[in-house]
Amino acid sequence: MLTYPNINPIAFSFGPLKVHWYGLMYLIGFIGAWLLGYWRIKHYKLNWNNDQLSDLIFYSALGVILGGRVGYMLFYDFQEFIHHPWVLFKIWEGGMSFHGGLLGVVIAAWLFCRKYGKTFLEVGDFVAPLVPLGLAAGRLGNFINGELWGRATDVPWGMIYPHVDDQPRHPSQLYEFGLEGVALFILIWCYASKPRQQGRVSALFLMGYAICRLIAESFRQPDSQLGFVAFGWLTMGQVLSIPMLLIGIWLWWAKR
C-alpha cells in the first residue's frame, strides 16, 4: 500500500503573499492552452490570430474560474453557500466544478463569437484540443490538496490518506489525471490533427470527457455532504456528465 505524501499546498511565498499549488495548476493550464493554441494556429494555418487566441483564453479563464466556483457551490455545497456565502471567494481552498466551469466557458465563448463573428462550433472545435491538459493540471491540484480521494480498496496501489482515515483508497485524482487529462488529450489532439466536419471535435470532447468522468467517478468517494444523488449509486459528477454525453452523441450524429 502507498501513503499519501502530504504535500504542502503552498508552493512558495512572497512575504505575506502565499501562492498555492492549486491556483498555480490553473495558471499552468491556461498558459499551456495558449501555447497549444498558438502551435495549432501556426502548424495548421488556421483562420485565427494571436489577438483572438489571447482574448479567447482570457474569456475562458474568467468563465472557468467564475463558473467553476459558482457551479461547485450550487451543485455540491449549496447549504454551505446559503449559510456562509463568503466561502464563494475562497478558491484557494479548492472546490471547483468542471461542469460549472464548462457552463462559464460556454457563456464566454458566446461573447467571444459575438465580438469576432465566429460560429460557436468553430470556437468549440478550436478550444477542445486545448482543454484536457488543463484538466490534468487541475487534477494534480486536487491531489496536492489531498481532496477528492477515492473509495476504500484492497488493490496493491491503494493509498492511505492519513487526514481521512487508515483505509487504503483509490487515488482517484490520479485516475482522473490519466483519463480526463492524458488519455483525452491524446484522443482529441490526434483526431483534430486532420480536417473534420465542423462540430465533430466538439462532439468527441463532450462524449470523451463524459465517459472518462463516468468511469473515474465510480472509484471516487462521493462528496460527504451529498453522497449518492440518484438510484443509490450515481454521484453528482456522473449525473452532470450524462447530459454532456447525450449532447455529444446528438452533435456527432447531426454532423455525420
Swiss-Prot record:
Residues annotated as binding a 1,2-diacyl-sn-glycero-3-phospho-(1'-sn-glycerol): R139
Gene Ontology CC terms, in alphabetical order: plasma membrane
Key words of the record: Cell inner membrane, Cell membrane, Membrane, Transferase, Transmembrane, Transmembrane helix
Subcellular location: Cell inner membrane
GO annotation, biological process: lipoprotein biosynthetic process
Enzyme class: transferase
Residues annotated as transmembrane: 19-39, 56-76, 91-111, 231-251
Metabolic or biological pathway: Protein modification; lipoprotein biosynthesis (diacylglyceryl transfer)
Major localization listed first in the record, in broad terms: membrane
Domain of life: Bacteria
UniProt key word Cell membrane: yes
Record's keyword annotation contains Transmembrane: yes
Membrane topology summary: Multi-pass membrane protein
GO molecular function, one term: phosphatidylglycerol-prolipoprotein diacylglyceryl transferase activity
Enzyme Commission numbers on file: 2.5.1.145
Function description: Catalyzes the transfer of the diacylglyceryl group from phosphatidylglycerol to the sulfhydryl group of the N-terminal cysteine of a prolipoprotein, the first step in the formation of mature lipoproteins.
Family, per entry: Belongs to the Lgt family.
Name this protein carries in UniProt: Phosphatidylglycerol--prolipoprotein diacylglyceryl transferase
Source organism of the structure: Legionella pneumophila (strain Corby)
